[in-house]
Design a protein with these regions (language model features):
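Hydrophobic alpha-helical hairpins/lids featuring a short glycine-rich hinge
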Residues: 85-131
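ACP-dependent fatty acid/polyketide chain-elongation machinery
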Residues: 1-68
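Active-site pocket-shaping loop/turn-to-helix segments
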Residues: 14-23, 66-81, 128-140
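Conserved small/polar residues in nucleotide/adenosyl-binding loops
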Residues: 145-151
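Structural motif
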Residues: 6-8, 102-103, 134
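N-terminal amphipathic, basic-rich helices that act as targeting or association modules
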Residues: 2-4, 8, 72-85
Length: 155
């Protein structure tokens, strides 16, 4: 049997329809607010559901470089920024901690659909050579763990 280990959550970060940082999101939850809104980004006349819960006012300026933004789907960018917020929220000096004792836990329902759709259209119109080699890693949820760990010097 493996030795039991304690897990301590030291920092949290969130990008959500209720806010793009922890305190705002928490206050909106306590206030009973909903992140759902009528869809205005496209015509929903033919759709049975006319609402969604989009992330709004996402500010990545101080968190992501241009190359990362170009290579990964916006939902992966949410995960990267939320991870950075969690690290900041922890208050830990990461350079002074054994990296084998640090982990990042990330949750997401679904994402990358914009990137998948754009690449499917590109494939059909222009052929496979026009698909970016960053298509799959830029569209899947595990991308943010892969991209976050070097940022916080864990690998």
């Amino acid at each position: 049997m493996a030795a039991s280990r304690r897990v301590v959550v030291t920092g949290m970060g969130i990008i959500s329809p209720l806010g793009n940082e922890l305190e705002t999101t928490w206050q909106n939850i306590l206030a009973g607010k909903s992140g759902a809104k009528t869809v205005t980004a496209f015509d929903v006349t033919e759709y049975p559901t006319k609402f969604a819960a989009p992330v709004e006012n996402f500010d990545d300026v101080n968190h992501l470089d241009v190359k990362t933004k170009r290579r990964v789907d916006e939902f992966v960018q949410y995960g990267l920024v939320a991870s950075k917020h969690a690290i900041e929220n922890s208050g830990l000096e990461l350079n002074s901690i054994d990296s084998s004792r640090i982990g990042v836990s990330i949750g997401s329902g679904i994402g990358g659909l914009d990137t998948i759709e754009k690449n499917a259209l590109t494939l059909n119109k222009r052929g496979p050579r026009k698909i970016s080699p960053f298509f799959v890693p830029g569209a899947i949820a595990v991308s943010y763990t892969h991209l976050t760990l070097p940022t916080i010097r864990l690998v």
